Regions:
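Intrinsically disordered, low-complexity regulatory regions enriched in serine/threonine/proline
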Residues: 1-2, 28-34, 39-105
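Short, hydrophobic/aromatic-rich segments at coil-to-beta transitions
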Residues: 18-25
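Amphipathic alpha-helical segments
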Residues: 1-17
Length: 105
Protein backbone atom coordinates (compact mmCIF):
# COMPACT_ATOMS: atom_id res chain seq x y z
CA UNK A 1 0.00 0.00 0.00
CA UNK A 2 1.22 3.49 -0.73
CA UNK A 3 0.43 6.71 1.14
CA UNK A 4 -2.61 7.52 -1.02
CA UNK A 5 -4.12 4.01 -0.69
CA UNK A 6 -3.59 4.03 3.07
CA UNK A 7 -5.19 7.47 3.38
CA UNK A 8 -8.19 6.42 1.27
CA UNK A 9 -8.66 3.25 3.34
CA UNK A 10 -8.38 5.16 6.63
CA UNK A 11 -10.85 7.90 5.66
CA UNK A 12 -13.36 5.28 4.48
CA UNK A 13 -13.03 3.37 7.77
CA UNK A 14 -13.65 5.98 10.46
CA UNK A 15 -10.37 7.86 10.58
CA UNK A 16 -10.40 11.64 10.32
CA UNK A 17 -7.76 14.32 9.88
CA UNK A 18 -6.91 16.03 13.18
CA UNK A 19 -3.84 18.28 13.40
CA UNK A 20 -2.48 16.90 10.13
CA UNK A 21 -2.66 13.22 11.15
CA UNK A 22 -5.18 10.50 10.40
CA UNK A 23 -6.79 9.97 13.80
CA UNK A 24 -9.31 7.94 15.77
CA UNK A 25 -11.13 9.55 18.69
CA UNK A 26 -12.80 8.44 21.90
CA UNK A 27 -16.57 8.03 21.52
CA UNK A 28 -17.02 10.34 24.53
CA UNK A 29 -14.65 13.01 23.14
CA UNK A 30 -14.99 13.07 19.33
CA UNK A 31 -12.57 15.99 18.87
CA UNK A 32 -9.68 14.46 20.83
CA UNK A 33 -7.44 11.98 19.01
CA UNK A 34 -6.38 8.88 20.94
CA UNK A 35 -4.82 6.95 18.03
CA UNK A 36 -3.03 8.61 15.13
CA UNK A 37 -1.19 7.61 11.98
CA UNK A 38 1.66 9.82 10.92
CA UNK A 39 2.28 9.43 7.19
CA UNK A 40 5.91 10.26 6.55
CA UNK A 41 7.85 10.12 3.28
CA UNK A 42 8.77 6.43 3.44
CA UNK A 43 7.10 5.06 6.59
CA UNK A 44 3.83 5.22 8.47
CA UNK A 45 3.85 5.39 12.26
CA UNK A 46 0.90 4.46 14.50
CA UNK A 47 0.86 6.16 17.89
CA UNK A 48 -1.45 5.74 20.88
CA UNK A 49 -2.11 8.52 23.38
CA UNK A 50 -1.40 7.50 26.96
CA UNK A 51 -3.66 8.69 29.84
CA UNK A 52 -0.94 11.17 30.87
CA UNK A 53 -1.26 12.81 27.43
CA UNK A 54 1.98 11.59 25.85
CA UNK A 55 2.03 9.79 22.49
CA UNK A 56 3.64 6.35 22.40
CA UNK A 57 4.68 4.65 19.16
CA UNK A 58 2.76 1.39 18.74
CA UNK A 59 4.01 0.43 15.27
CA UNK A 60 6.01 1.71 12.34
CA UNK A 61 6.38 0.21 8.89
CA UNK A 62 7.61 1.14 5.42
CA UNK A 63 4.83 1.59 2.86
CA UNK A 64 6.32 -1.16 0.70
CA UNK A 65 5.80 -3.71 3.48
CA UNK A 66 2.11 -2.85 4.02
CA UNK A 67 -0.34 -5.20 2.32
CA UNK A 68 -4.11 -4.76 2.26
CA UNK A 69 -6.07 -7.71 3.67
CA UNK A 70 -7.94 -9.41 0.82
CA UNK A 71 -11.24 -9.55 2.74
CA UNK A 72 -11.29 -6.37 4.82
CA UNK A 73 -8.81 -4.10 3.06
CA UNK A 74 -7.20 -3.42 6.45
CA UNK A 75 -3.45 -2.86 6.11
CA UNK A 76 -1.39 -5.72 7.49
CA UNK A 77 1.94 -4.87 9.02
CA UNK A 78 0.91 -2.16 11.47
CA UNK A 79 -0.48 -4.48 14.14
CA UNK A 80 -4.11 -3.37 13.77
CA UNK A 81 -5.25 -6.98 13.79
CA UNK A 82 -3.63 -7.64 17.20
CA UNK A 83 -4.29 -4.36 19.05
CA UNK A 84 -7.14 -5.11 21.50
CA UNK A 85 -10.25 -3.02 20.85
CA UNK A 86 -8.84 -1.38 17.74
CA UNK A 87 -11.46 -2.75 15.35
CA UNK A 88 -14.26 -1.69 17.70
CA UNK A 89 -12.82 1.83 18.07
CA UNK A 90 -12.56 2.13 14.30
CA UNK A 91 -16.16 0.91 13.88
CA UNK A 92 -17.42 3.38 16.53
CA UNK A 93 -15.68 6.25 14.73
CA UNK A 94 -17.06 5.19 11.33
CA UNK A 95 -20.60 4.78 12.72
CA UNK A 96 -20.46 8.21 14.37
CA UNK A 97 -19.38 9.80 11.07
CA UNK A 98 -22.16 8.05 9.12
CA UNK A 99 -24.77 9.05 11.71
CA UNK A 100 -23.54 12.66 11.67
CA UNK A 101 -23.94 12.75 7.87
CA UNK A 102 -27.47 11.29 8.11
CA UNK A 103 -28.56 13.87 10.70
CA UNK A 104 -26.76 16.75 9.03
CA UNK A 105 -24.38 17.17 11.99
Amino acid sequence: MDKEALTAWALANGWQMIAGCLSLTKPSAPKEAIVRMQLKATVVTVEVKKPAGKWEKAASQAYGKLVADEETGMPRGLGFEVIPGFTMLMRDNRDRQVFAKMTGG
